[in-house]
Regions:
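Extended, charge-rich alpha-helical interface modules
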Residues: 1-74
Length: 74
């Protein structure tokens, strides 16, 4: 797997992780029920599933294709 593809996939998975974490935080801090999402526990469960899938994909990619080396630009 080439470096650019790995970086792109890593960015994608990190974005999915951050998105899920942010939404879970919003649900946990706001005690207002959103009409479109009355099943808060179900929604958080779905978000946790997305979070775990993205983390697992990153772990599998690192296991089989190595870690991403971030190059700093000065």
């Amino acid at each position: 797997m080439n470096e650019r593809l790995r970086r792109t996939l890593t960015a994608r998975y990190q974005a999915e992780i951050e998105d899920a974490k942010y939404k879970i935080k919003c649900y946990s801090e706001q005690e207002v029920i959103i009409p479109e999402h009355p099943d808060i526990t179900g929604e958080v469960d779905k978000l946790l599933e997305k979070l775990s899938q993205a983390e697992e994909k990153m772990a599998v990619m690192e296991l089989h294709y190595g870690k991403i080396v971030v190059k700093s630009v000065l």
